[in-house]
Amino acid sequence: NFDYVVGLALHEGSHIAYSDFNAFAEVRNLSKVREFDLDHQKMEFFRGVINYIEDRRVDGIVFRGSPGYKGYYHSLYNKYFNSKKVANGLSSEMYREIDLESYMFRIINFTNEATDFGALPRLLDIYKLINMKNIKRLKSTDDAIELSKSVCEIVWSMVDSVKGNGEGDNENSENGENKESEGSSDGGGNGTEVD
């Protein structure tokens, strides 16, 4: 399928027009985000969240300004985010541990209909904070970075609290149930609109 390749080229090319690469460079020099010291893992997670949010911001600009490209973007999203393979991963018992890898997998796949907001604590809060349907409110790369800081603040607090309490893997509470998120454990994710 050629369409997703065109979609990927359009997506990457749109960063040249709409992303501020100086802002990305400044992020690389940070040693702290809000009250969190940045070790290598936190920095990589932070950069991943920035990339995800900036991608959605830029895609939103192109969607609104060039509706003729929508089909290519739909092919791109269907290939990488809305595939059955990703849906199977979201529905499985994988990526349910309170760690950075699990949060990243769940966040970057919010567009998939198999999204399960009950998979991790505060996942629904993160989804609402990103507010994909109103992504156009982000006017710049700096706005995407600030939103990413807020997302990371939630995730790092959750991950650090588990590390600090010495809880075992995949334990979200005393009885293994997720008490922190308002999402249902049976899925409940309708995905988010790309356009």
Regions found by a protein language model. Give the residues of each.
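Short, functionally important secondary-structure microenvironments
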Residues: 1-195
